[in-house]
From Swiss-Prot:
HAMAP family: MurA (MF_00111). The lineage of its organism: Bacteria, Pseudomonadati, Pseudomonadota, Betaproteobacteria, Nitrosomonadales. Belongs to the EPSP synthase family. MurA subfamily. This is UDP-N-acetylglucosamine 1-carboxyvinyltransferase. It comes from the Bacteria. Its EC number is 2.5.1.7. It is found in: Cytoplasm.
């Protein structure tokens, strides 16, 4: 099993190029199911979840016309098998995103209940309720969602909780429904906006993406075309947090600051100097971080996907911080590993109290999920001595060449078998 070996203590200097966003690329790949015409997607990151999604689409009957670095062209002219098997879905929750497009395009879908990171219950009931409101007949049998419909009908759907994949699934399904669909309590994440822009480019009629009410007027068909996936805001935030923790001066290129307002504000609160350009962000840190308290919540609030990285930052901050997780239960699994590096953290329910100490000490730790992996890398970069991060297969689901990108700005990090 592969591991990362990190020798901490180095400041970071230089430039890092940001990849396309995994959480935008996956739904855009699924959107290719909505048209019989070729569809090209650019700025796709080379990640394990993307590879898994492409394999799933091929099983469904999608032809991959080209698959070059950063660009993939797909053709879903002949969908032969509207099924996502357990073997394909178990490692990637985003596979649920084929449900809406398959049902809208073919009238049927057989989708295994999803897996993914082990960070708590993330039910798909909002997807199912929404599609049922649009006229679909759905049953759960032997761990599979069995769905069928003649043609979906527009409906007013008020989601009980804010769900990004639920919003994306229902928005895609509604593009080919008869009539108008109104999604209430919709997710506002930039990735939802990116998907909406992709669908509009294919001929969909969508208004309100980025707000909590989205209106979709169904059309008879969507056409092909191309779409450029937005930069990864979580990768951007992860590298910025690493620089703020380690100290140094790094510019991230090919990214967007407008999707990271709250994160940038918290980094400034920690003491970082930040400059912003049209497609770049520069962060300079020349002092010990100040503690940053935060509370995760749906966008545009502080993202749950950045909570673990900020915990690593707070572990060596000059004071005490309070971090509250409101999105997922069981998303403090990295705390136990941070304490192996001598971090001083207490967990009380959904709140972690982090007492910053001057120095972490290197040790062997084990990654438990994708963002916990990033947290432990940052912790290793600031720890004295050697840190070994085990079970890093999580990393390859969401970060493209993270160790190479860190090494090019001065981190002492390498992957070993």
């Amino acid at each position: 099993m592969q591991k990362l070996v990190i020798h901490g203590g180095s400041k970071l200097h230089g430039e890092i190029s940001i990849s396309g966003a995994k959480n935008a690329a996956l739904p855009v790949l699924c959107a290719s199911l909505l048209t019989a015409e070729p569809f090209a997607i650019q700025n796709i990151p080379h990640l394990r979840d993307v590879t898994t999604m492409l394999a799933l689409l091929e099983q469904i009957g999608v032809r991959i016309l080209t698959n070059e670095p950063g660009t993939t062209e797909l053709s879903a002219a002949n969908i032969t098998n509207p099924t996502a098997s357990y073997d394909m879905v178990k490692t990637m929750r985003a596979a649920i995103l084929v449900l809406g497009p398959l049902l809208a395009r073919t009238g049927q879908a057989h989708i295994s209940l999803p897996g993914g990171c082990a960070i708590g219950m993330r039910p798909v009931d909002q997807h199912i309720k929404g599609l049922q409101a649009m006229g679909a007949e759905i049953n759960i049998e032997q761990g599979y969602i069995l769905a069928q419909v003649g043609r979906l009908s527009g409906a007013r759907i008020a989601m009980d909780v804010v769900t990004v994949t639920g919003t994306e699934n229902l928005m895609m399904a509604a593009t080919l429904a008869s009539g108008t669909t109104i999604l209430e309590n919709a997710a506002r994440e930039p990735e939802v906006i990116d998907l909406a822009n992709c669908l509009i480019g294919m001929g969909a009629k969508i208004e309100g993406a980025g707000n909590d009410i989205i209106i979709i007027e169904g059309v008879d068909r969507l056409h092909g075309g191309s779409h450029v996936v937005m930069p990864d805001r979580i990768e951007t935030g992860t590298f910025l947090t690493a620089v703020a923790a380690c100290g140094g001066d790094v510019t991230l290129i090919g990214t967007r600051a407008d999707t990271l307002d709250v994160v940038l504000g918290k980094l400034a609160e920690a003491g970082a100097d930040i400059d912003i350009g049209g497609d770049w962000i520069r962060l300079c840190m020349q002092q010990r971080p100040q503690p940053v308290s935060l509370r995760t919540a749906p966008y545009p609030a502080f993202p749950t996907d950045m909570q673990a990285q900020f915990m690593a930052l707070n572990s060596i901050a000059g004071g005490t911080s309070i971090m509250t997780e409101t999105i997922f239960e069981n998303r403090f699994m990295h705390v136990q590993e941070l304490t192996r590096l001598n971090a001083d953290i207490q967990v009380e329910g959904n709140t972690a109290i982090v007492h910053g100490i001057p120095q972490l000490d290197g040790a062997s730790v084990m990654a438990t999920d994708l963002r916990a992996s990033a947290c432990l890398i940052i912790a290793g970069l600031i720890a004295q001595g050697e840190t070994i991060v085990d079970r890093i297969y999580h990393l390859d689901r969401g970060y493209e060449q993270i160790e190479q990108k860190l090494a090019q700005v001065g981190a002492h990090i390498k992957r070993i078998n």
